[in-house]
């Protein structure tokens, strides 16, 4: 197959949905029927091929997106299986960025669930064409038609029904193909590998005709010639219908809806046919956005094998046998083992060593890969998620991915000194794999703080640290970093004297402390500082060599404020006068005097406690708005704005961080899991006096 031609035969797809809708089971069946897997893996037995981490097989949920390659008809399908739990939406986001199309799996009983809405919005953001598979049609309470209505109501989507179920619940035995107008029935005893076509059952004829008419009404709008033919009463051929469904799917004019039961092995082969027939190849996507490094100009790059090499790294994974693996999606050109390329984001060269095609966690070495391929590279040194790898002579940076800020943090400390070094290595490796996981050190407590997207996210990180890196750690409760400041100008004149035989100590300082916002002639470079020091000594009242001692003393002592021992910020100290002794004065004496002046003077400045305020954004369906706003108000939140976005509402509020612990769980229960939120640090603000009293009492 020529390389140019090959692009038409590739489908890069994701399978995404709410937790438990049956994504992983659907993927397992696809691998089985395309011949990649000789035994079907069942999720509830902990044997699914795609769920290859220990934690996944125990919990029966997918945490990392496993990538695998299979063939159907004459097409190559690269599948990314993505997690459905809200704490792992970053994995979904990464996958969607590099996919050309997606299959959204819905639970036939539950319909459109909360995480389905989140994933759908993420797919909208990256303009990913998609089709819908209503799964679990064999389950008690499954209702295909209700699911179709929910697609319209909850997602604002335009569903195009191309199949109807034959039989319901335990009597579900097949589908009606509305393109061919035939029933497709599966033999139970053949594990779904055998199925046959027959005429539509008599009791379903009318329903099939009704939905066939709806299908034709929607697709003929995309082609004037076919519309004329249809309106004049001529038959529209199956090939014409398929061509128009493909056109409408790629342009997101509508979303084809199919049905089946992956667990009962029904409906998977027609789903594969639809992936090949209707979802785009890299050529259909045509271009990718990016920036030319030499000119700095934004431009569109054609997806083509003949163009210079450009690829996006979308996932880092630690493989126990190969080491660090970097998953890349190649957008243009080709690479071979041994080639040197450049990471244009970091401006570092990388040599391509082993190149692997992945099948869940089995691997196959390849020597060459080209546009449209998704491969894993072993041994890259500097490349992280979101980086571009490019041809050295024609350098480009592809559109970067955006990652949400972590919303929950915990302190961790190693149980023993042996764990100390291992913990540092483990956390840095895990952070390289997952951009939504951050590690920092709290300079006040010296503790290591880990931050993530939710409690399950951090629980799994700690679990992986224990299993993969053999690190035992103690986990602390989340903490808030309070600060202190003064609210009015105060002045202190302090003399430090010490005589106890031998050389004495003497230093006198007169200092004015003032809140930064009240300083009239503040220099621009000082406006964002927490502490500003200035000396206005004239005529040598304090010799020049002693003045740094005053600044050092103030800088050290301000780390423990006068209310509850939190760092003092947003103030200016001006040294206006002082006195010294020829023999007994020293830098140390002036440092001690400055510290004592701070302790005595600051309480006169009406000090106040400050707390971090977060900007919180909640995206919620309309019906939960009242409860969510009421809850934010009860958390001392101030609503900033409320705006519609699609068929959801976006509420922005400023809320103290101390009130946000446990909010993930509250929001889930208030909205039945349908709302989502993100938060970023906004500013420090005064703590109300009654809350400040409680904080002081705890110190």
From Swiss-Prot:
GO molecular function, one term: translation elongation factor activity
InterPro entries on file: EF-G-like_DII, EFG_II, EFG_III, EFG_III/V, EFG_IV, EFG_V, EFG_V-like, G_TR_CS
Cited Pfam families: EF-G_D2 (PF22042), EFG_C (PF00679), EFG_III (PF14492), EFG_IV (PF03764), GTP_EFTU (PF00009)
A biological-process GO annotation: ribosome disassembly
Any one GO cellular component localisation term in the record: cytoplasm
Protein's cellular compartments: Cytoplasm
Sequence ranges assigned to domain tr-type G in this UniProt record: 8-283
Protein name: Elongation factor G
Lineage start: Bacteria, Pseudomonadati, Pseudomonadota, Alphaproteobacteria, Rickettsiales
Gene for this chain: fusA
């Amino acid at each position: 197959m020529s390389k140019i031609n090959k692009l038409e035969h590739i489908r890069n797809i994701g399978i995404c949905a709410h937790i438990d809708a049956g994504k992983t089971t659907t993927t397992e069946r696809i691998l089985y029927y395309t011949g990649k897997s000789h035994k079907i893996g069942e999720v509830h037995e902990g044997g699914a091929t795609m769920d290859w981490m220990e934690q996944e097989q125990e919990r029966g949920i997918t945490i990392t997106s496993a990538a695998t390659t299979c063939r159907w008809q004459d097409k190559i399908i690269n599948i990314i299986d993505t997690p459905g739990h809200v704490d792992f939406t970053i994995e979904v986001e990464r996958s969607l960025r590099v996919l050309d199309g997606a299959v959204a799996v819905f639970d036939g009983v539950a319909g459109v669930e909360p995480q389905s809405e989140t994933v759908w919005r993420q797919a909208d953001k990256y303009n990913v064409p998609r089709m819908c598979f209503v799964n679990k049609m064999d389950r008690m309470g499954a209702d295909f038609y209700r699911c179709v209505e929910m697609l319209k109501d909850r997602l604002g989507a335009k569903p195009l029904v191309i199949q109807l179920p034959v039989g319901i619940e335990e009597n579900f035995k097949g589908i009606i193909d509305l393109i061919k107008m035939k029933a497709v029935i599966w033999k139970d005893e053949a594990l779904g590998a055998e199925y046959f076509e027959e005429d539509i059952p008599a009791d379903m004829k009318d329903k099939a005709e009704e939905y066939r008419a709806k299908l034709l009404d929607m697709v003929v709008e995309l082609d004037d010639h076919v519309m004329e033919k249809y309106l004049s009463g001529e038959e529209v051929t199956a090939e014409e219908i398929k061509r128009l469904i493909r056109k409408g799917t790629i342009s997101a004019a509508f979303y084809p809806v199919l049905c089946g039961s992956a667990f009962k092995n029904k409906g998977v082969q027609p789903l594969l046919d639809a992936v090949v027939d209707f979802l785009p190849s890299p050529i259909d996507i045509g271009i990718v956005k990016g920036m030319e490094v030499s000119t700095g100009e934004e431009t569109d790059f054609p997806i083509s094998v003949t163009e210079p090499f450009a690829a996006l790294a979308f996932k880092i994974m630690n493989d126990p046998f190969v080491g660090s693996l970097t998953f890349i999606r190649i957008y243009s050109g080709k690479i071979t083992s041994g080639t040197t390329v450049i990471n244009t984001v970091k401006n570092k060269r990388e040599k391509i060593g082993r190149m692997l095609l992945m099948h869940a966690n089995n691997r196959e070495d390849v020597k060459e890969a080209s546009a449209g391929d998704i491969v894993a590279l072993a041994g890259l040194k500097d490349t992280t998620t979101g980086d571009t790898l490019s041809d050295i002579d024609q350098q480009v940076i592809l559109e970067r991915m955006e990652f949400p800020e972590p919303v929950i943090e915990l302190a961790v400390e190693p149980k023993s000194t042996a764990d100390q070094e291992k913990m540092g290595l483990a956390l840095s490796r895990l952070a390289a794999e997952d951009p939504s996981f951050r590690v920092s050190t709290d300079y006040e407590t010296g503790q290591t703080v880990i931050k993530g997207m939710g409690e399950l996210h951090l629980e799994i990180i700690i679990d992986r640290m224990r299993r993969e890196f053999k690190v035992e750690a103690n986990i602390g409760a989340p903490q808030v970093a309070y600060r202190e400041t003064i609210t009015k100008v105060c002045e202190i004149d302090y003399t430090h004297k010490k005589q106890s035989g031998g050389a004495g100590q003497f230093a006198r300082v007169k200092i004015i402390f003032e809140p930064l916002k009240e300083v009239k002639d503040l220099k621009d470079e000082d406006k964002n500082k927490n502490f500003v020091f200035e000396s206005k000594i004239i005529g040598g009242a304090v010799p020049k060599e002693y003045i740094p001692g005053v600044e050092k003393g103030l800088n050290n002592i301000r780390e423990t404020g006068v209310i509850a021992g939190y760092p003092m910020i947003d103030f200016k100290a001006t040294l206006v006068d002082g006195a010294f002794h020829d023999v007994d004065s020293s830098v140390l004496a002036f440092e001690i005097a400055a510290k004592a002046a701070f302790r005595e003077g600051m309480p006169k400045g009406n000090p106040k406690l400050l707390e971090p305020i977060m900007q919180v954004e909640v995206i919620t369906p309309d019906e939960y708005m009242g409860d969510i706003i009421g809850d934010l108000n009860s958390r001392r939140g101030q609503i900033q704005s409320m705006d519609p976005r699609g068929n959801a509402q976006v509420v922005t509020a400023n809320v103290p961080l101390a009130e946000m612990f446990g909010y993930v769980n509250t929001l889930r229960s208030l909205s039945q899991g349908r709302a989502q939120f993100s938060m970023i640090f906004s500013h420090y603000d005064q703590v109300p006096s009654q809350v400040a009293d409680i904080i002081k009492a705890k110190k």
